[in-house]
Amino acid sequence: ARARAQEAAVHGEVPVGCVIVRNGEIVGRGRNQREEKQAAVSHAEMEAIAQANAALGSWRLDECDLYVTLEPCCHFGKQPPCVNAILEAGISRVVVGSADPNPLVSGKGIAALRVQGVAVTEGVLREECDALNRIFFHFITTKRPFVSMKYAMTMDGKIATVTGASKWITREAARADVQQQRHRFSGIMVGVGTILADDPLLTCHMENGKNPVRIVCDTQLRTPLQAQVVATAKQIPTILATCCADPTRQAIYRQAGCRVICLDKRNGHIDLVQLMEKLGQEQIDSILLEGGGTLNWAALESGVVQQVQAYIAPKLFGGQEAKTPVEGAGVPVPSAAFRLKNSRLTHLGEDILIESEVEYPCSLEL
């Protein structure tokens, strides 16, 4: 079930997986496929039940056990609840990994099964299942996007040479993995400095990839009208987040196809907490932050980053003035450092990827 959930995540779905077992043999497998199939009923449980029905030649699954990574839904939304399908199929035992924090579910799915006599075992591999759903859990509980700060750097901590050149730090395998991340995340965010320096398109380059919503933090609306993100704004959703209240200036970008969100200023920058609230209201549940050192520091200082993804190449750039991933004012003493936890290391050819969760002091937690 976890493997199916991971497969769902790769395809940009909410990572839920399900298997149905009869007499020790898997007879049905399913994962969330709503986006892929554009079908409201394509929840993991529904897919697994349909496959088991076909395999056994029966709509009744009385002698079967169902294993699912996330508590089955019990509310009517765009489809009937998965709990209803489980009961209708006559499944006698359900094993659940994670409880669903969604207030519409939150234990109600498990309770509904038990009331009807289904044996339910909770919390099996809970930590592993929770990790699969970090983005979903964060968004459903905070109403703000899950933000992953991603950068590529050399082993001496440089994201560019002293001349500002950065193509390419990592090799093909690492860059291909970045495209997978762009496919999975709802939004991608950079600062205007990145636009001015690199003029990136900020799209997903993989075949059949899904382009994230592009978000540019531009305090004074300095993004050139000929920049690629503006030139393609009518084809790919693009948001300019700014503190510039000039209606004439805003209208120029809107006419080009951009959405302009005017925000307050905080510590000399766009109020990123306010921006996250606005983006959450638009159902943007996750953001890949590909900013430079200034924006990355502002995001950490604001407490909006949940994860760091560092792609590290076995190279040394040197250079006192060469850019680093996190700049800004910095912390005064080592004890004030932003701490990272639950780190995971992945080899990508000669490069490595380190993914860590950010641990904030209580005063910074959103």
Language-model segments: residues:
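Residue-level signal for inorganic ion chemistry
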Residues: 1, 17, 48, 73, ...
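Short, basic/aromatic recognition patches
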Residues: 1-11, 139
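Short beta-strand scaffold segments in enzyme catalytic cores
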Residues: 16-24, 151-152, 354
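Zn2+-dependent cytidine deaminase-like catalytic core
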Residues: 28-128, 213, 239, 244, ...
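Short gly/pro/ser/thr-enriched loop/turn and capping motifs at secondary-structure boundaries
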Residues: 101-104, 127-128, 196, 222-224, ...
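Active-site ligand-binding patch in enzyme domains
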Residues: 138-144, 148-155, 159-285, 294-297, ...
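Conserved histidine-centered catalytic loops in small-molecule metabolism enzymes
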Residues: 245, 327-366
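Flexible, gly/pro- and Lys/Arg-enriched active-site loops
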Residues: 301-340
